[in-house]
Amino acid sequence: MATIGMLYICTGKYTVFWPEFYETFSRNFLPGCKKEYFIFTDAPSIAYEDDPAVHRIDQPAYDWPLSTMKRFAIFLTQEKALEQLDYLFFFNANLTCREVITPEEFLPRPQQGEQLLLVQQPGFWNKKPMFYSYDRNPRCTAYIPYNCGRDYVSGGLNGGTSAAFLAMCKELDRRTEQDIRNGVVPLWHDESQLNRYAAEHPGNYRLLTPAYWYPEGWQMPFEQKIIVRNKSRYFDVAAVKHHSQHTRSWLQCKWEAFCENYLPYLLCARDKLLQKHL
């Protein structure tokens, strides 16, 4: 029987999602496998902590965006326990497992050279790489030129064999600390780092469709196996991230549309001409 480490961070307001996550993933996710839940939280107690498979780990809440950038370091605090398991998977707090997901459809396939498991980000599943929101800042360790990259993956569900996942965490934690020292914040934080790592290891991961990362209320041609719950129905997301709302002018909207829909063609041609690479 394969052993699965379920890595879950729920600090602050995100603890509201834990009960439904536990209930649906215990019932539907990888039946026949032994699941161990590692819950990193600042809550003094959580639901189901009496279950021997639930391990509550004290974790102070970081301010935004360190709360996402520091994920790899958080996981590594439990390295000795995690390396004893066969597979490790990280899940965003607001996920719920709607359908039964079998090991055959989800786990990496070693016979095909796969050690990691990644999921397509639903906003980009049908777009060309030049339109992906990779980090384009050459000063950032997550930088990807416009002429590079193959897939755009979600930062909120990923994993693999314990050895491969922990090796990835160590490398991405090193890069994150380098960015922090240099005063650089990746565009989408841990997700930008994950996409750079995927671009460097294109044959090393199993890529799942957005069926396994299906935002609540969206309409896509995929089954709804793992649902991403709308956080704004539970708390003020902008307040948690210390974001303020700004009204954009007509000219700003037009410029943003140009940058999103047309500018990538020019930048991709430039990077090809300059023969940029990872």
Where does each model-flagged region fall?
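N-terminal anchoring/stem segment of glycosyltransferases
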Residues: 1-67, 78-84, 251-278
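Short, solvent-exposed loop/turn segments at secondary-structure junctions
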Residues: 11-13, 44-45, 61-62, 95-97, ...
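A structural signal for short, well-ordered beta-strand segments and their strand-loop junctions
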Residues: 38-39, 88-92, 117-118, 159, ...
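Active-site regions of enzymes building and remodeling cell-envelope glycoconjugates
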Residues: 49-62, 74, 114-116, 223-227
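A conserved donor-nucleotide-binding helix/loop in the catalytic core
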Residues: 59-91, 99, 189-198
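Conserved donor-nucleotide/metal-binding helix-loop-beta segment in metal-dependent transferases, i.e.
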Residues: 97-138
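Catalytic core and acceptor-binding pocket of nucleotide-sugar-dependent glycosyltransferases
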Residues: 141-233
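C-terminal catalytic/acceptor-binding lobe
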Residues: 196-278
